[in-house]
Amino acid sequence: PLYVRPEIIPEYADLDVYERSQARSARAQAAADVEAIDRDRSWNAKLPVLEAVHALGLEGSRELSYQAFRRLRGTRLGDLATWCALTEVYGNDWRTWPEEYQRPSNRAVSEFVRAHEERVDFFMWLQWIADQQLSAAQSAGRDAGMSLGLMCDMAVGVSGAGADAWMLGKLFACLLYTSPSPRDKR
């Protein structure tokens, strides 16, 4: 969601003038006096704008598209969104969370989802928006003559503290030793 452009979400146009002005100001501040990309600063600038757009809700075909995305992505999307919401409360490393939240299948996690349904929905919605924008970028690249379109990179591993390890913990052998990714061969 860090790479989502709030300004091109269709519902963004429904924000009032003040909210759009605040969004432009936050965007300018996040980019000001920065020599390198500051992801935290960028995310903190986008978050309130994305929350405001999400709060507007969806109608018609957009709502149907979102619900279809949720059905298609299933449990894993819900688990990822739950992990995101839990990180806001307990921090980025699930291994330091209270034990009852350390497995997505725990009853406490289901209770958390019910108590934070709107926040979990926000994170699922963000994934839908990111998927739409990535698809649009892919189409634009292909239409511009890029035979492959966008080329996405695949991670060589996952963080033991991250969502993948939390969601699929029993499938991962989290090693104590880590090394940097291999260099690209050119």
Predicted regions and their residues:
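Basic side chains
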Residues: 46, 185-186
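Conserved small/polar residues in nucleotide/adenosyl-binding loops
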Residues: 17, 177-184
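Acidic/aromatic-lined carbohydrate-recognition and catalytic surfaces
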Residues: 1-169
